[in-house]
Amino acid sequence: MIRMTLLNKHLIHRNVTFRDADDALKSMATAMVENQYVKPTFVDAVIRREHKFPTGLPTGGIMVAIPHADWTNVNRGTISVATLEKPVLFKNMGNPEEDLAVRLIFMLAVSEPHAEVNLLRDLMGIVQNQATLQGLLDAPTDLDLFKRLEDMFQDIVVDKEKKEETSK
């Protein structure tokens, strides 16, 4: 089993503003490239995938999106998180005709085939809790947001087939 530290302070964005979903995806993915978690191809791949298979989730009062791209574009697994000052419209995963005003984005980069299924399952348990999401939006500092996320993700299992490993 692999347990990874999936978070990097440089990939946590608090109270940011984006023009639209594509701007958010490009900005977050570019930060992943700059920190060598993903290949440059990840930027276009995550945008293309979002257009074809939307990731907006109607999770209640605070909507989220969980964009991701194929593992072949990833060097090392990570999660980038953005809390948005103003909502950005993402298409609903279950109804692509519907726009959702998203306030939280969890961008996934998974380096193992099929590992994203486990990560998505674990993440779904987190994003369905409105109090948890509100706590992320209310984080008063970048460091506080990072610590809250670190607590949330400390036991996320990425791949059940491998030996225990930690990377940062």
Where are these regions (language model features)?
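Cytosolic covalent-transfer regions centered on His/Cys nucleophiles
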Residues: 1-168
